[in-house]
Amino acid sequence: MICLFGNCNCQTGIFGLYDYVSFLYHSPSSCRVRLVLSLPASPNHMEEQSPKFESSFPRRTSEGPVDDVGKSPPASFYRELLANKAQQPQLSEDEEDHNPKDFLFKEDSEDELLIPDSENHNSSSTSPRKFKVENIRWGSDTLNGSILPLNSQGSNLQSLLSNVGELEHLLSKDVAKHSKYLKEQSSKVEKARANIVTNLTRLSLVLSSIFNTYQAKAQDKQAILDKIEEWEDEKKSLLDDMKEVLSTDDNADGETHKFLELASESINVENEIEALETRLKQLKIKQRTLKNECFQSQGIIESRLSNFVQAVEKIEMRERKSIEQVVQQLSENQLGYWNDNLALEVMNGLTINPGDISLVEEYEPVDILKQVESLEKPTIAADYHLPKNTNKQASRFTRQLLEFNYKCQPKLNVYPVVGLITKELKEDSAKEQEYKHRYDQVTHTLSALKDSFALIYHTEQQLQSITQSTQDLKDFQSLMNQMVESLLKTHSEADQYNLYLAKDVLAQEISIIHQALNKLNQSTEYSSVESDNVKNHDGLLFQTFSKAQERTKLPSIKSATSIRYAPSLYNSLSPTSTSKTTAKGEVNYDAGINKYTKVKEVLRSGKGNKDE
């Protein structure tokens, strides 16, 4: 951590917002500042640049660029950064905080960023290009989508699910570090913020991939069910046409009835031949004639049935292929109760054996929402019985009737498989909704934190510009109060939508900013209006920390603002050269405040110059 005007060696140990209070006791010509965040140049734009954080949490883009401040690093920079981090051995927390490859900053390099060689076409392959930290734009939408999630390319569903746990673990560590660095007033807080945004972006991409995977699975299964239902309806229509061909009703064409009557008469004639040998010759001639007519009728029936049979076979072939794909997929995934034996049993159960055919039954199309145990089969001549005979002719005609029935019988029983597919569809739909909700939560949290960090960054840039144009602390208080109000509004909406991570991070940020406001109020004699505003913020912050403390065990607002927990905050509001240390180790700020009062009087009287 360095001083606001970094070239000096005062070692105030401050960062962020508190750097801007140090200008009261240092000359800008002798110091420089290391900035982490920025805000647009004019305080009048605070409302325009405040985070637009509503129920859908849309991403906010800047009204216009302010020089090069806020420019996002190229996407390849983050990809190489993640690749380098994945190849590194596991480090302890302290080693990880000081590992230059773990974050954008290079230690002791005047706040410069390391950019991969592929982005610098004018540099050598071994020397990285330097990228100034002021060129980071927290509010830029280019950050979203430029960071690749772990194992997101070519990975299966299990690897994506494992990445969710890994990213959530990394995110919890980043939030803990963010809280720790804020309390310690460490310059690594910007690194923690960037890690939070990076991991949130990666998590949102992984959850989006999981959501898309389950959505695709559900759509595939739904498409199969829709096709099966369509094919079953078409099959029902064809079977109805078959039934009409075989019908013996008066409104039918009479071929089936004719066939049955001819067969019966042939049998009766044969009986007459046995009883009346005197009429044997005439009856045999008649019998041959009836047989020929019966065979002709049989040929007509078979010809009419052939097209329908082929159409049904094509439909059932498509059904079988679709069902085989589903069963194979379920078996390969080893989900739930699925195994190879069950898959084989399901496929064998699809085929209807000829021995299962009866003469009197009806077929109905499949109902997707209801699974039945047995398949009803279409038949002919439900109310017609052939005459009994002791010779072979009766059995031959009976077999012919069964053959007709078998041709009109569907050969594929899809009821059990439809029930299984419907069950899998419900499970995939439930997973789809679950991960869509988690994806929305992470996306909203990411949007809220990116906008809040951008607001803090732009505010600090605005405060820096104030140090070069005014010595009035009212400008500081007004600008910081506006920033606190915007952050409190974002925190309130995060609480409304149960974005716990965003609430905790914003509570830490608001607490640190609030400590600076308290110190400004203690060091000046301005109106009570500003103090009232700070008190109002204090009350809301106190409630916020009371809720957050139950889950995260954060220190209370009183302990967070005491000199024991934030000594670097008070050091940041007064230069080391003008402060005095008491016997107990506390800092006396009266000397610095008196010096500021004298300088202020000289400037107002016009007797001194700016150097004085």
Curated annotation (Swiss-Prot):
Induction: Expression is induced by methanol and glucose. One of its GO terms (biological process) is autophagy. It is a peripheral membrane protein. Signal peptide: none annotated. Keywords: Autophagy, Coiled coil, Cytoplasm, Cytoplasmic vesicle, Membrane, Protein transport, Transport, Vacuole. It comes from the Eukaryota. Residues 214-296 form a coiled coil. The keyword Cytoplasm applies. Residues 44-72 are annotated as: Disordered. GO terms for cellular component: cytoplasmic vesicle membrane; vacuolar membrane. It is found in: Cytoplasm; Vacuole membrane; Cytoplasmic vesicle membrane. Interacts with ATG35. Required for the autophagic degradation of peroxisomes called pexophagy, but not essential for general autophagy. Involved in resistance to elevated pH. Belongs to the ATG28 family. This is Autophagy-related protein 28. It comes from Komagataella phaffii (strain GS115 / ATCC 20864) (Yeast).
